[in-house]
């Protein structure tokens, strides 16, 4: 018999029987139930986004603070550069001042030498005045308590009394300060 002769009969191949029915996994069913609660997914996502937002906000605040610190450091460095702009020139001029002082230390015997010394003295005085106007001053050393920030001990001698201990007894080379910085420490002899 053919299918055409019995149209009301079904093809047994197409029929679903209990043993051919797709089996449902109980774990899959519970997963489907979990997926059905979208509120938990949104809460989790909100928590993650909040944490990420807090992290980004923290990074932003740190970056902003770092920028402010850099700007403050830049302003301070710029102020230091302006404050000490003449420092290198002053260091270059100090040896010339030393030479002028040495020239004045030589005894002048005749009138021509005395006139030359007078010119050297005027030049030195003018140079010292210009240095003072720029904030460059001589470090007071002789008779002062030895200060390693201002003095360089080249030699030590025995102190004649207790008051003289750790005091400068002789200056071998003058020292100079530029505002609050030591340009060149005074080379001194210290009593011990």
Curated annotation (Swiss-Prot):
GO cellular component terms, A-Z = cytoplasm
Q: Where is this region: Disordered?
A: 1-43
What are its GO biological-process terms?
protein folding
What Pfam families does UniProt report for this protein, alphabetically? GrpE (PF01025)
Main localization (coarse): cytoplasm
Instruction: Tell me where on the tree of life, at the top rank, the source sits.
Output: Bacteria
Alphabetic keyword roster:
Chaperone, Cytoplasm, Stress response
Q: Name one GO molecular function term.
A: unfolded protein binding
Where does it reside?
A: Cytoplasm
Write out the similarity annotation.
Belongs to the GrpE family.
| Subunit note | Homodimer.
Q: What's its job?
A: Participates actively in the response to hyperosmotic and heat shock by preventing the aggregation of stress-denatured proteins, in association with DnaK and GrpE. It is the nucleotide exchange factor for DnaK and may function as a thermosensor. Unfolded proteins bind initially to DnaJ; upon interaction with the DnaJ-bound protein, DnaK hydrolyzes its bound ATP, resulting in the formation of a stable complex. GrpE releases ADP from DnaK; ATP binding to DnaK triggers the release of the substrate protein, thus completing the reaction cycle.
- Its name, as the record gives it, is Protein GrpE
Q: Which gene encodes it?
A: grpE
